[in-house]
Every structure is written in C-alpha cells, then in structure tokens.
Amino acid sequence: GALQDTDRAWIVGETSFGKGLVQSVNRVWGGAGLTLTVAKYYTPSGRSIQRDYSAISFYDYYLHRNDNGKHVEEPPRGEALHTNTGRPVFGGGGITPDIEIKPGPQPGRLFYGVFSFVRQLAAGQLAGFREYRIAEMRYKTRLTAEDLNRYPVTDQLVAAFRQYLFTKPQFNVTDEQFNAHLDYIRAQMRREIMTAAYGLEAGEQAFLPDDIQFRKAVESFDKARELADIARRADRQ
C-alpha cells in the first residue's frame, strides 16, 4: 500500500486480505480472552487497510464467501484518496491492485488430488513409475533444465493420475473437469514433483511459467517504469 501510494510500485494480482488492526487480548473468566482494537494501520495517503464488516451480520461474516473460502469482494466505496501523482485509490478493503488478475477457477479437488498422487509417486508406491521415486530431497534454490527433464510430466503420467483420481471418490472430479483443466494439472504436477525433489522454492520456480499473475506482472514492466519516471519528475518539482 505504501509503495502504491508513493507511486513506487505498479501492483498486479488480487486484492489483499484487508486485515489492518492492532489488537490486544484481555483475559476474562473461564480462560477466555476479549480482543480489543487499540489502533488501525493506514497507508501514507490515509487509506485504512482494514476491511469494513460493520454492514454485515456475524452469520454473513462466516458464510458469505466464494468457492475458495474468501469473503465475496465488493467494489471500493467512499471518498477516493490519491497517490503522490494523483491516481485515485480507495481504502476499507485491503489493497486493490492496479491490474487485477485472478487465478483460474481450478477446482480445489484437483489441487489436492495432484498433491496426494505425487506424494505416492515420490514414495515409489505407483507401479510402472519407479524412476519417479525420490529417496531424499536435495534442496535447490535454482532449477536447471536437467532438473525438470529428470522427472517429466508425460502423457503416461497424466493418464495414471486420471485413473488414480477416478478411483478416489473423495475428489469427485468429472471427465469434463479433468479435460477442461488439463494444462493446470500438468503444471501442478510439475510443481509438486519439483517440490518433492528439490524443495518448496524449486516447486514455485517450476510453476512460474504457468502462473498467469506472474506472466502479467512481467508484461507490466514498461508500465511500472513509466510510473516511476512520472514519480521522479513529480519529486523534482
């Protein structure tokens, strides 16, 4: 938020959570605690980070959520504040990006299905795929093409995952869902295999080429440079 207010960053992605309270916990009877808000965080323009829940009920707070468990977002309300170069920004709901890019609507069942499948794959428990067994994780901070090629996501591996998924009723994935998200499945399998072999950071690196938010951020470098130039000229005036 501070970087956005001072025009030092061009934000790409999703609206942040909207938690900007400073709270203290006071013990009460029965071992419980009473949380009191004693301060709020504000950005340099005067925006409150905290999402406003005053107009919804306790029931809506817990149940008015989307498929990913997040509160359904509403557009910014109230008076607009401005960045150093005059761009309008709004408070009361986290930090809204300059370019909003939401991840694709992949069913969570596919995410957990891939996770479960790769755990068994890396443990050497899937017949016909012994070459994917990972006896020990070798932590790496930078992947090479050789690392990626050591555990390729082949058509045979994807077919084995399909069969695995359809024998697990808890995932409840249809043929239509599987085929519609085939690119995501391949990318997520690559990510989980690299995580099992080389660590979490390596897994994230493997996923970056398929991350639509990352790709859009890279495409926005020219816009970020333009904004930085405008901010520098404004500072000199």
Q: Where are these predicted regions, by residue range?
A:
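Conserved functional hotspot residues or short segments at active or partner-binding sites
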Residues: 48-49, 53-237
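Short, ordered coil/turn segments that flank beta-strands lining enzyme active or ligand-binding pockets
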Residues: 29, 44-45, 84
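Extended catalytic-interface subdomain
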Residues: 24, 36-57
